[in-house]
Amino acid sequence: MRIIVVDNYEKMSKKAAAMIASQVILKPDSVLGLATGDTPIGMYKEIIDIYKNEKMDFSKVRTFNLDEYYGLNRENPQSYYYYMMNNLFNHVNIDENNINIPNGMADNIEIECKEYERKIDKAGGIDLQILGIGVNGHIGFNEPNISFESETHLVNLNEKTIESNSRFFSSKEEVPTKAISMGIKSIIHSKKIILLACGSAKSDAVSKAINGKINPNIPASILQLHRDVVVIIDKEAASKLNLK
């Protein structure tokens, strides 16, 4: 695990975007695992800037998003499909057939989850996976005490996650209580992983994930076992880390 501590959110975003650009330049048909939420928005803006400067080509890139709220259709502004189109896909030359996001309105969740795993396998696995980390240590929507053997599945969101995500909705009551998420096993099979975190609110989760014991209660702690993880965090998120 390589840990890069930067001064602020902007530098974190630039560093992550540069690493994604390098991946795509080296392997134009890269399979990218993408995340949503506040943390990667700056990274996506930086990627768009790189693309506009003709230094990045998305025409052969394939993407798989980590998760999607269950019960939200794609037109809902709070859906992660809407988020991805607005923050990245509408601004680059990606083939829409190469975009993969779980269907939050699927009639049969079990089939949807198995098909998502099949698509990842058929693509050859994820070359580079982007992750954020929740205040409770979750990655994707894999909440504490999730099995490390889990694949794409339907998740019951816990109270802390619902509370944290309520800032994106008009009220806490509007936040979906379930989501479809790639599982820990799905994530850990990625060839390379970049974990992003910014701000003091994430410092405890970051410290437990990196310095603590590998424990299903802190899902991100499983990353300690991965052979190629880069953690890019600002000074506030790193404030409780033991970097010795």
Swiss-Prot record:
One of its GO terms (cellular component) is cytoplasm. SUPFAM superfamilies: NagB/RpiA/CoA transferase-like. Gene3D superfamilies: 3.40.50.1360. It catalyses: alpha-D-glucosamine 6-phosphate + H2O = beta-D-fructose 6-phosphate + NH4(+). Its EC number is 3.5.99.6. One of its GO terms (molecular function) is glucosamine-6-phosphate deaminase activity. The keyword Lipid metabolism does not apply. The active site is at residues 67, 136, 138, 143. Keywords: Carbohydrate metabolism, Hydrolase. Pfam families: Glucosamine_iso. GO terms for biological process: carbohydrate metabolic process; glucosamine catabolic process; N-acetylglucosamine catabolic process; N-acetylneuraminate catabolic process. Pathway: Amino-sugar metabolism; N-acetylneuraminate degradation; D-fructose 6-phosphate from N-acetylneuraminate: step 5/5. Belongs to the glucosamine/galactosamine-6-phosphate isomerase family. NagB subfamily. Catalyzes the reversible isomerization-deamination of glucosamine 6-phosphate (GlcN6P) to form fructose 6-phosphate (Fru6P) and ammonium ion. This is Glucosamine-6-phosphate deaminase. It comes from Clostridium botulinum (strain Loch Maree / Type A3). The lineage of its organism: Bacteria, Bacillati, Bacillota, Clostridia, Eubacteriales. The gene is nagB.
